[in-house]
Amino acid sequence: MMVMTDKFNYEELGLKVGLEIHRQLDTKKLFSPVPSELSDKVEFTFQRRLRPTMSELGEIDPAALEEFKKGRVYVYEGNYELTDLVYMDEEPPRGPDREALEVALQIAYLLNAKPVDEVYYMRKIVIDGSNVSGFQRTAIIATDGKVETPWGAVGIPTICLEEDAARIIERKDKEVIYRLDRLGIPLIEISTTPDIHHPEQAKVVAKFIGDALRATKKVKRGLGTIRQDLNVSIKGGARIEIKGVQELDMIPIIIEREVERQLNLLKIRDELRKRGVKPKDIKEEFYDVTDIFENTKSKIIARVIKKGGKVLAIKLPKFRGLIGREIQPGRRLGTEFADRAKKYVPGIFHIDELPNYGISQEEVNKVIERLNLSEEDAFVLVAAEEEKAKNALREVIKRAREAIEGVPEETRRALPDGNTEYMRPLPGKARMYPETDIPPLRIPDDLKKKIKENLPELPQAKVERYVKEYKLDRSLAQTLVDDERDELFEELVSMGVKPSLAASILVVVLKGLRKEVPIENVTDEHIREAFQLYLEGKIAKEAFEEIFKELARNPSKSAREVAEEKGLTLLSEEEVTRIIEEVIQQNIEVVKAKGMGAMGLIMGRVMAKVRGKADGKLVSQIVRRKLQEISGG
């Protein structure tokens, strides 16, 4: 299923995409009976250093090793309500939480997967400080799931139940501060096979999985509760893991940009090979060019030299004109070099972008002369403490050698504009070993049977039912379900509220107030009470907006209190008639002249007085009757 506006022929390029979706479950923590909530309250802190250990295969994971080399100390903040000894790594884990396991099984069945007979927890090595223990506990709950799409079926080989990491509060040069409230929140991890061959197909699969998760009503909502990772590759390229895709609509854009990046990196590789350069031609030789910049106008370099730092350069044979080549909109090969060097220095300078940043052409020429560069050769400069500068340039050398080979396998971070940046090497397989503190857990057959027979309705099926059963507009039904207002909607309908009115108030009115007031303060109980007043004939439907506005500002009040305080309780028919007669008398000349043509004018002026206190339909009937009496007389 090709789309005419495709930027690339993805089939020809051999595009392969796999998804990995993580979503927090709304239960207690996975291995401790404490609430899974976030809090800014800090009652204690402690610190740790973490070191990589060998897996059961006797190997050390490269990503863990790179993290260890940063030499950081990790500080942990916590409070006694949301953190216990389990998540301070001072006590063995308990559990796993029964409710979290049941929700995971629900999700497995909704995704056509087969639950395992026994759950075995493993330890995944993570030493970036986000887990106090230095590992994350994870277990396979189900296998062999499937999502059908217009492009073909996509497999779900594993569904795992694991614990979320601590949340980062502050990152310093040699210290990182984490808060422990998020550590241990149950996290469902759903991985697909790389059978996605079109960017839009990836979006369809992610939406279906998201719908299955939301159907349980047991997943958390809000920023940071869902994380979507992509694995992307093309023929001749490499598998790239892209972390932290937040929005569904960004998935196709990020995939397209990654395809573009890999294609451009392959073009750069081909050009370098054409120029005859090999990885071994890039030597780890550092040139001290500090003296060239003694009187520089570059503020960055001058500041470093003043503090006793140095300006070091490396030679990149045959790279001139390629470091500045764009590989994604606004990003160049030089940006890739800078991303690698970032762990040691804020930035780098390279020949393709100079003169610039206060660096003159004369200074550039002197560096070219000092390094004895040909017209095809390039240089990269770093201004920093000598050891930091050397480490940064080593990273550039490593990345430049990789550019000659093609596309390096790595983990990258999704950026808001759809581009990506380097995070770390792609994790190896040497990061898992068995969890010895948690015994295997057998899933009883009767529990599986009970869950399978009581699966929730999938969101799309619910939308179709609302359209058919309640005669709702499709977009209204879709929004009800997407905003997770469906349960409240069905409750209101069961109370006797017309489906169209309930949906309109929940979607149109409440969403419309979002820019004016903190509408999140209006609870389901507030909404139920307001509708009860309406059903009792105490308020008109026009009063809902005013009542919800006031409740958003003052959530401690009840809907009944607001209706009475604001004078929104319904006027009697006699009172409405009296107000209409007054308005007609005030405009009698117009009424006599226009007769029924004055209907709009009188209605407008009456509604200005009684809006929210009288039913518009009733007002219209009385106005029509009164005008007919006058016209007939």
Curated annotation (Swiss-Prot):
GO terms for biological process: glutaminyl-tRNAGln biosynthesis via transamidation; translation. Its EC number is 6.3.5.-. It catalyses: L-glutamyl-tRNA(Gln) + L-glutamine + ATP + H2O = L-glutaminyl-tRNA(Gln) + L-glutamate + ADP + phosphate + H(+). The keyword Zinc does not apply. Signal peptide: none annotated. Disulfide bonds: none annotated. It is an enzyme of class 6 (ligase). Pfam families: GAD (PF02938), GatB_N (PF02934), GatB_Yqey (PF02637). SUPFAM superfamilies: GAD domain-like (SSF55261), GatB/YqeY motif (SSF89095), Glutamine synthetase/guanido kinase (SSF55931). It comes from the Archaea. Keywords: ATP-binding, Ligase, Nucleotide-binding, Protein biosynthesis. Residues 414-437 are annotated as: Disordered. The keyword Protein biosynthesis applies. Gene3D superfamilies: 1.10.10.410, GAD-like domain, GatB domain, N-terminal subdomain. One of its GO terms (cellular component) is cytoplasm. GO terms for molecular function: aminoacyl-tRNA ligase activity; ATP binding; glutaminyl-tRNA synthase (glutamine-hydrolyzing) activity. Allows the formation of correctly charged Gln-tRNA(Gln) through the transamidation of misacylated Glu-tRNA(Gln) in organisms which lack glutaminyl-tRNA synthetase. The reaction takes place in the presence of glutamine and ATP through an activated gamma-phospho-Glu-tRNA(Gln). The GatDE system is specific for glutamate and does not act on aspartate. Heterodimer of GatD and GatE. Belongs to the GatB/GatE family. GatE subfamily. This is Glutamyl-tRNA(Gln) amidotransferase subunit E. The lineage of its organism: Archaea, Methanobacteriati, Methanobacteriota, Thermococci, Thermococcales. The gene is gatE.
